[in-house]
Amino acid sequence: MTLVYMNMALAFTISLLGLLMYRSHLMSSLLCLEGMMLSLFVTMAVTILNSHLILANMIPIILLVFAACEAALGLSLLVMVSNTYGVDHVQNLNLLQC
């Protein structure tokens, strides 16, 4: 395993542990999810560049599109929870029912 892959696996693991440990605030959960998506993007881009797959060059860009959609939905949910309850605790997400 090269140094780049080991660093990206470590970054993904640290982000996953952060997501599992700091679940009380929505903002910290969103930051950990973004760290996971960024490490996946770099890993996929390096893998595709090393294997010289021309047709697979679009896959990391599609992952970035999904990451941007996830960030936009997460931030809009954060704004809605903050405006409704005044805090960004994940516990309040169960109370947001129609």
From Swiss-Prot:
A single BP term in Gene Ontology: ATP synthesis coupled electron transport
Record-given protein name: NADH-ubiquinone oxidoreductase chain 4L
Catalysed reactions, semicolon-separated: a ubiquinone + NADH + 5 H(+)(in) = a ubiquinol + NAD(+) + 4 H(+)(out)
Membrane-crossing residue ranges in chain numbering: 1-21, 29-49, 61-81
Gene from which the chain derives: MT-ND4L
Membrane topology: Multi-pass membrane protein
Subunit structure, as described in the record: Core subunit of respiratory chain NADH dehydrogenase (Complex I) which is composed of 45 different subunits.
Job of this protein: Core subunit of the mitochondrial membrane respiratory chain NADH dehydrogenase (Complex I) which catalyzes electron transfer from NADH through the respiratory chain, using ubiquinone as an electron acceptor. Part of the enzyme membrane arm which is embedded in the lipid bilayer and involved in proton translocation.
